Amino acid sequence: MTKIYMDVCCWNRPFDDQMQARVHLEAEAVLAVVSEIERGDCQLLHSEVVDLEIANTPALELRQRLQILIPRQHRYIRCDQKISDRALVLEQRGFAGIDALHLACAESAGADVFLTTDDRLQRLAARHEHFLRVRVANPLTWMQDRLTN
């Protein structure tokens, strides 16, 4: 079973302004991934980093929507010293603190893919793909690949 880690950019996508075609398509891809998780076709890896980031979302309504969207059946990753140490190494490679923590959580749990809609993070991950222990992809691109293979 494919193990998927999704950052908060991904989880937010269905609630972003859908007027841009790209945003709309990425939102549909995120919802398709959620459907696959709910059907048991994929396993969601969820972390306390995601929970913390969502808890710090200033808009109460958005925070509540995010909490409802995330499937309840998931494997939960708690941060430990190993994850913190790996995140520090990733920060030294240029990853932002929260992104480094997300990546370290995904790696620690053996994720097959780390999904994000953050272009900057995707570009940086592509430059360091030999160093990362998880594939980083856009949910739309990943879903298209999954459907054609």
Kindly label every feature range from the protein language model:
Residues L52-N56, F95, D119-L121:
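Acidic, metal-coordinating catalytic cores used for nucleic-acid/nucleotide bond scission
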Residues L60-L66, L124-E129:
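Short, aromatic/basic amphipathic alpha-helical patches
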Residues C10, V50, I83, L101-H102, ...:
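Alpha-helix capping/helix-boundary segments
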Residues Y5-P58, P71, Y76, P139-D145:
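PIN/NYN-family metal-dependent endoribonuclease catalytic core
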Residues F15-M19, K82-E91:
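Short, basic, glycine/proline-bearing loop/turn elements
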Residues T2-K3, D17-A27, E36, Q92-R93, ...:
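Acidic, PIN/NYN-like endoribonuclease modules and their adjacent C-terminal/linker elements
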Residues R78, G97-A100, T116:
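Short beta-strand scaffold positions
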Residues R63-L88:
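Helix-adjacent hinge/juxtasegments
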